[in-house]
Amino acid sequence: GSICLEPKVVGPCTAYFRRFYFDSETGKCTPFIYGGCEGNGNNFETLRACRAICRA
């Protein structure tokens, strides 16, 4: 869906969560560190969830 086209958002908080986002340029789900707040929908707890929703 459209959340897969949203940019990666780390957010202003300083927690350390390993998450995955769909990189629309490469067509792959890629790990990133999420700060814990003010993210968007392109933020998945697992690689499997990212691939399932974004069909990567």
Curated annotation (Swiss-Prot):
GO cellular component annotations of the record: extracellular space; nematocyst
Disulphide-bonded residues: C4-C54, C13-C37, C29-C50
GO molecular function: ion channel regulator activity; serine-type endopeptidase inhibitor activity; toxin activity
Record bears the keyword Ribosomal protein: no
Subcellular compartments: Secreted; Nematocyst
Domain BPTI/Kunitz inhibitor: 4-54
Acyltransferase found in the keyword field: no
Site entry: Reactive bond for trypsin: T14, A15
Assigned protein family: Belongs to the venom Kunitz-type family. Sea anemone type 2 potassium channel toxin subfamily.
Record's miscellaneous remark: Negative results: intravenous doses (up to 1 mg/kg) has no toxic effect and generated no behavioral disorders in mice.
Function of the molecule: This protease inhibitor shows two different activities, it inhibits both the capsaicin receptor TRPV1 and serine proteases. It partially (max 50%) and reversibly inhibits mammalian TRPV1, a non-selective cation channel expressed by sensory neurons of the pain pathway (Ref.2). The second activity is a weak inhibition of trypsin and chymotrypsin activity (Ki=0.9 uM and Ki=4.5 uM, respectively). In vivo, shows analgesic effects on mammals.
Full protein name: TauPI-stichotoxin-Hcr2c
